[in-house]
């Protein structure tokens, strides 16, 4: 993120930084055990606050200013921002709905690696070997918008998206040690599971990469769309990606993957961001009138991910107060970066 280069190069540098932060978070799998849930919940809460602040000061505020200064909307200057914001949220929501049709719910071992439900584990029966696959302290993680664990209500009843039922565990899951050979390598059908995992993570990271690319593509289009603002957005997304890398690698390690393989797939979750960032920068450079829509689209996608995934995940394991105060701290830190250094 160096001044004096084109917006596309800036976007590439910015998203390489966010990818590096994902890898740094995933590398913590070499240090932390899979039972240290408080650390992850606090980090996720902090990331949620950072992303909410970045969505407004680095994306929505420039979008509103561009729509207002264009003069083409008059009293309806809010319209392109509202449309873009709604479309961004809808993009993540629809991508989430498509995951079951791509086979993400058909293989229980995929869910087992990423969804270790504390409620199910607390009710484990010592007489049932399938209930003792993982200790109660094991992590229960979702991967962004397409994650495998989500406490929500549908028609008044709590359900968990893409949840592994107890019958799935009994019928289709072997103990974690049998998933891999003695060298920690995945079994014969694991490459399909890995492909589904990468697909889920990729869908989640596209909006973040787009946000960085659009942010750099919008530089100097309005007074609030500055290089500093785009740089701060990349820093904020990098901060958010740090616990995300850990949220991928730690459950995989607990599910029986070797430490190096857990790290590899954890850092892989950020690989799509440079591609999405370059695409976003190219799009706004070539079609400047779409800038308000593009900025608001990125903001809507990120806010939806925060509200639908990061905040519920941070609250689900009994560390809600810690996560909430960490969110406040993250918001203040990102606001200070944008206002003080923007």
From Swiss-Prot:
The gene is Slc39a11. It holds the Pfam family Zip. Zinc importer that regulates cytosolic zinc concentration either via zinc influx from the extracellular compartment or efflux from intracellular organelles such as Golgi apparatus. May transport copper ions as well. The transport mechanism remains to be elucidated. GO terms for molecular function: copper ion transmembrane transporter activity; zinc ion transmembrane transporter activity. One of its GO terms (biological process) is zinc ion import across plasma membrane. It catalyses: Zn(2+)(in) = Zn(2+)(out); Cu(2+)(in) = Cu(2+)(out). The chain crosses the membrane at residues 12-32, 44-64, 72-92, 194-214, 263-285, 290-307, 322-342. GO terms for cellular component: cytoplasm; Golgi apparatus; nucleus; plasma membrane. Highly expressed in the testes and portions of the digestive system including the stomach, ileum and cecum. In contrast, expressed at very low levels in liver, duodenum, jejunum, and colon. Keywords: Cell membrane, Cytoplasm, Golgi apparatus, Ion transport, Membrane, Nucleus, Transmembrane, Transmembrane helix, Transport, Zinc, Zinc transport. The lineage of its organism: Eukaryota, Metazoa, Chordata, Craniata, Vertebrata. It comes from Mus musculus. This is Zinc transporter ZIP11. It is a multi-pass membrane protein. The keyword DNA-binding does not apply. Induction: Transcriptionally up-regulated by zinc. Up-regulated during lactation. It comes from the Eukaryota. PANTHER family: ZINC TRANSPORTER ZIP11 (PTHR11040:SF211), ZINC/IRON TRANSPORTER (PTHR11040). It is found in: Cell membrane; Nucleus; Cytoplasm; Golgi apparatus. InterPro entries: ZIP. Belongs to the ZIP transporter (TC 2.A.5) family.
